[in-house]
Amino acid sequence: MLFHRTGVFEKVKLLPPFIHRIAAGLALLLLPVCASAQELTPGAYWPLPGGINILTFVDSFNWGDIAFEPSVPVDDAHATINTTAAAFTRTLSIAGRSANVGFQLPVVVGHLEGLYVGVHTELDRFGLGDPRLSIGVNLYGAPAMAPKAFASYRMHTLVGASLTVAPPLGQYDNTKVINLGTNRWSVKPELGLTHASGRWVVELMAGVWLFTDNTDFAGGRTREQAPIGSTQAHLTYRFAPRIWLAGDANFYTGGQTTVAGVKHLDLQRNSRIGSTFSWALDNHHSFRASISRGAYTTIGADFTSVAVGYNYAWTR
């Protein structure tokens, strides 16, 4: 049910065509993968010694406005979305290079509201989003190292690559136009360049999200989405070996959707800016906090986001 508190839309089969434009637009918001192109991830390719296990807990709170394509009769739309995720990462060696593999599982709570043809309407969701599997390897500048060798390592110029896969395992119900799972596969290859000089670190990343079709969208329709290209830039200052602060920015474009053969005017050209702070207490415990906001938004979520995370690391 969509906007269930007013009963405006009770069954997917009865929805007029433009409602599916609303559904396609909202589908960009609640899903954890939808926010993936918006990510700001400083330090993603910084090397670690092999044989380290890292357990991570992250809570992010997002709130703001929603921009729809002009033909959608929704005004004053805004949302609050809270995502709590648990993740596990293992560092290792691949062909003599430092690398890592990871798994992440998100739980999402979302509330959306706005004016549909002048009537105040609301929607709530709670459940599991699509998980993510990832693998990353430093192709240049960071060979695989044991902890003793890593203690004397100094980062200079790195080139890394990663692959993230989100299988369609999140909560999904084809009788609802808005779901937490995507009912499709999402894959993101990415390249990253890191250069460190003294206390400063500059990072540039470029990737693209690729999507399979959702063949059971909103009552059995097929929803296609074009790739979303994303770039990130980060400038980090290291106050001490375990404490750093980064300025973050990104830009992402693409993602136009087609539902039942009808193209929507929802091409995204959006960007975000923010800042990230990281503090490691010792070799086992570290904390990270970040804040970001939309700098330019055409279609989708113009959100402010605040996140806090905790990492626990151990060997073998």
Which stretches of residues belong to each language-model region?
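Outer membrane beta-barrel transmembrane domains
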Residues: A218-R316
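Surface-exposed strand-loop-strand hairpins of Gram-negative outer-membrane beta-barrel proteins
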Residues: N62-T83, T121, N174-N179
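Residues on the lipid-exposed face of transmembrane beta-strands in outer-membrane beta-barrel proteins
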Residues: F57-D59, A86-R90, L133-L139, L163, ...
